């Protein structure tokens, strides 16, 4: 069984959702909303010195951090789930491109947003502008990604991949779905489709309940 260090509404939800689709046993061993402060981060530092989520501990006890790395590793361990283009497949390069883009360009903004003092120190007067600029940056990145894709049923074609799950979870965070739908109309129907997957209905309700305010 896989063990996860995670939190409801966090990046671990993408990992958990993929494991649900794969029908692979797992448990959230430690629930730690790290954005709530040092006490929560202290629950994670024994396995990740960066004190960040998610963390996956394999059945052999190996620790894997970084959401994209975990998702890619899981697709290699469970190829029968068919949640990633195979090496040599026509969509493989774009799959790897966007799986890397999300943590590099988008996910990283939330380290700043969760606690603006990490960048601005005690100068609280600049917090609102910092939050606005990071939200604008996230929206711009979604727009860039949308402009480079031609989704079908899913982002890369007719077959769902972990990329679809990754985008569905990350697009629920600030600046939220309303703006996401505005700047990324091509991806909008895909994330709505993943929101509505029957296989994940109970899971979403438990780990990242749908908020009607997301819809524009």
Where on the chain are the PLM-derived regions?
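GST-like fold's C-terminal all-alpha helical module
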Residues: 99-196
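GST-like domain detector, emphasizing the conserved glutathione-binding G-site
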Residues: 1-129
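Positions that flank functional sites
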Residues: 33-34, 160, 209-210
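Terminal-tail/helix-coil boundary detector
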Residues: 200-216
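Active-site-flanking alpha-helical
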Residues: 75, 170-171, 204
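Short beta-strand(s) of the beta-wing in winged-helix/HTH DNA-binding folds
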Residues: 54-57, 155, 201
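Residue-level recognition of oxygen-bearing side chains
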Residues: 69, 186, 199
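Phosphate-coordinating loops and pocket residues in cytosolic domains that bind phosphorylated ligands
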Residues: 46, 196, 205
